[in-house]
From Swiss-Prot:
GO terms for cellular component: cytosol. GO terms for biological process: glycogen biosynthetic process. HAMAP family: GlgB. Monomer. It catalyses: Transfers a segment of a (1->4)-alpha-D-glucan chain to a primary hydroxy group in a similar glucan chain. Catalyzes the formation of the alpha-1,6-glucosidic linkages in glycogen by scission of a 1,4-alpha-linked oligosaccharide from growing alpha-1,4-glucan chains and the subsequent attachment of the oligosaccharide to the alpha-1,6 position. GO terms for molecular function: 1,4-alpha-glucan branching enzyme activity; cation binding; hydrolase activity, hydrolyzing O-glycosyl compounds. Keywords: Carbohydrate metabolism, Glycogen biosynthesis, Glycogen metabolism, Glycosyltransferase, Transferase. The lineage of its organism: Bacteria, Bacillati, Bacillota, Bacilli, Bacillales. This is 1,4-alpha-glucan branching enzyme GlgB.
Length: 637
């Protein structure tokens, strides 16, 4: 019926139609010699479904749909409707109530505060990123540098009239800016349609609709296309964990729970005032997995960061009172349907897009999140390392004189860093809701705060794991993220803030030019401690290695403002060592305690290694050394 195949219908109800957006929703077709639009919607509890909109003056009964499957699919054809027309579904429920709903599969929506779906224009966008897509197919993310600039498009920068920049304006401003800083990827906070600006996109009503705040779908494709032509990947925050309760959205779509669990205990997400998807329902699986495939295929998105995974996996994620708690059939707290859904999602995504990035924002200690599904894992590429982030920020917030009492928070991450493929996040969540900006978290006077911030970033970039920094991190903002205003761009007029900007740029350059810092991120062979035990002085030293034999860097971090002279560091090879990076450089706003010239190794064991060098350890800083060449003769001490 209406060019909808029996196979598509069958697979949708089996939970295995992974491109169900191709037949559900609104699509332009030829039907019986007429040009128009086919509408199809899943509403099994409805007694009647009509399409209403601008084209029929929102008359409730003028364009009824036909129920063409026993499982509740409704469809119809309407001729001579122009593109960009607004519409909704008028649904009469089994409770004999009438409701107006936006189309769950709509690819465009009205700009808030309006809430209707919009009939899309013909898809005429011509992509120019063939070379990027081709190289993505053979891309190995594990041995490649990944440095992500996390962005909320509405508050990165605004027009002179304090309005949002459009997708096309962002393409001309944001992309060159990110490229100049040296990032490899942009990660966008959710751009699915959402009614409330200050939800940041995490409470969605239109899963297939790119938000109209910044333009239309073609404009967003242009933005992504330009990213790819500048060799920048694009990752979307994707929210399959919950959806908002607005009346026009998915909640009780046909008058009864449909996309959400029927049991309110299971569906309620109390922390956010939202509803959980019913992961055990086949049609919901088809809806969500189709949505993931839609963004990856239709918009050439390079990866998805799956939001709030722990809230999906655990039935009692935000339930603390015993009488509120629920359990699975085996008496456990795991949502077994969510486990199965995520495994299915990742298997399907990688079958469609082998080079995709699938990243789990998971705050739990569940093992095997990034292990393959056939080995009992969830099948993600990467997991956000929330433990590293929490421990490190807690450590850095301590006055330097007290850090020795919390040394384990600095080093504990290495007890588990190779148990998963990790990404190290300094995300938007850490600079909002009274948590303070990264700079404001740092203790000490102004100089120490900036030095601590440089040290924080430096330790992050030399620690195993891919990198993510939220926008504004390069400006060293004093204020936390203001989710209604643009970044504090005026700070770049001040030398210390400008120094952080240049520092981030140089860190990205160091990171990408040295495979020691990324090539073996996922293997323990890529890291070796030199000295993790200097608790009293809060100095640590370690080695980062690449695949090539003897290609390695020596990293020293000093977490106090004390300068150490003639400090011995064990090194593995005899030769000349040169400092190639120092966060205390004057050009970054530091005090200039750098190591100039070459440092010859001495044939005396130190830190369990056959050689050592003597260096100056700068205050609240990170130093990176590289062996230059082996030498024939060692000087006397």
């Amino acid at each position: 019926m209406y060019h909808i195949s029996a196979e598509d219908i069958y697979l949708f109800h089996q939970g295995t139609n992974f491109e169900s957006h191709q037949f559900l929703g609104c699509h332009e077709i030829n039907w019986k010699g007429k040009r128009g639009y086919r509408f199809a919607v899943w509403a099994p509890n409805a007694l009647k479904v009509c399409v209403v909109g601008d084209f029929n003056n929102w008359e409730e009964n003028s364009h009824p749909l036909e129920k063409f499957t026993d499982e509740g699919l409704w469809g119809g054809f309407i001729a001579d409707i122009p593109p960009a027309t607004s519409y909704k579904y008028h649904i009469c429920s089994s409770e004999d109530t009438s409701i107006l709903k936006a189309d769950p599969f709509a690819t465009q929506a009205e700009r808030r505060p309006k809430t209707a779906s919009v009939i899309p224009a013909a898809n005429g966008y011509q992509w120019s990123d063939d070379q990027w897509i081709e190289q993505r197919n053979t891309y190995d993310p594990y041995s490649s540098p990944i440095s992500i600039y996390e962005v909320h498009l509405g508050t990165w920068k605004k027009t002179l009239k304090k309005q949002f920049l459009s997708y096309r304006e962002l393409a001309t401003q944001l992309i060159p800016y990110v490229k100049s800083l040296g990032y490899t990827h942009i990660e966008l906070l959710p751009i699915n349609e959402h009614p409330f600006d200050r939800s940041w996109g995490y409470q969605i009503t239109g899963y297939f609709a790119v938000t109209s705040r910044y333009g239309n779908p073609s404009d967003f494709k242009y933005f992504i296309d330009q990213c790819h032509q500048h060799q920048i990947g694009v990752i979307l925050d994707w929210v399959p964990g919950h959806f908002c309760k607005d009346d026009f959205g998915l909640r009780q779509f046909d008058g009864a729970p449909l996309y959400e669990y029927r049991d309110p205990k299971k569906s309620e997400k109390k922390s956010w005032g939202t509803l959980a998807f019913d992961y055990g329902r086949p049609e919901v699986q088809s809806f969500l997995i189709s949505n993931a495939i839609y963004w990856l295929k239709e918009f050439h998105i390079d990866g998805l960061r799956v939001d709030a995974v722990a809230s999906m996996l655990y039935l009692n994620f935000d339930r603390y009172d015993e009488e509120e708690k629920i359990y699975n059939t085996y008496g456990g707290e795991e949502n077994l349907e969510a486990f199965a859904f995520l495994r299915k999602l990742n298997k399907v995504v990688f079958s469609y897009i082998p080079g995709a990035l699938m990243m789990a924002e998971d705050s739990s200690d569940l093992p095997l999140v990034t292990a393959p599904v056939n080995k009992g894992g969830l099948g993600f590429n990467y997991k956000w390392n929330m433990g590293w982030m929490n421990d490190l920020l807690s450590f850095m917030e301590k006055e330097s004189i007290h850090r020795k009492w919390h040394h384990n928070r600095l080093t504990f991450s290495f007890m588990y860093t190779y148990s998963e493929n990790y990404l190290l996040p300094l995300s938007h969540d850490e600079v909002v809701h009274g948590k303070k900006s990264l700079l404001d978290k740092m203790p000490g006077d102004q100089w120490q705060q900036f030095a601590n911030l440089r040290l924080l970033y430096g330790y992050m970039y030399t620690h195993p794991g891919k990198k993510l920094v939220f926008m504004g991190g390069e400006l060293a903002q004093y204020a936390e993220w203001k989710d209604t205003e643009e970044l504090d761009w005026h700070l770049l007029e001040y030398p210390l803030h400008k120094g952080i900007y240049h520092y981030i740029k140089n860190l990205n350059e160091l990171y990408q030019q040295h495979p020691e810092l990324y090539e073996l991120d996922h293997l323990s062979e890529g890291f070796e401690w030199i000295d993790p035990h200097n608790i009293d002085q809060s100095v640590i030293a370690f080695r980062r290695k690449a695949n090539k034999p003897n290609q390695e860097l020596i990293i020293i971090c000093n977490f106090t403002p004390q300068v150490h002279f003639d400090y011995k560091i064990g090194v593995p090879e005899s030769g000349r060592y040169k400092e190639i990076f120092n966060s205390d450089s004057v050009r970054f706003g530091g005090s200039g305690q750098i190591n100039e010239g070459e440092h010859f190794s001495f044939p005396e064991k130190w830190h369990g290694l056959s050689q050592h060098i003597k260096i100056k350890v700068p205050p609240l800083a990170i130093s990176v050394f590289q062996i230059e060449v082996e030498r024939e003769r060692l000087p006397r001490e």
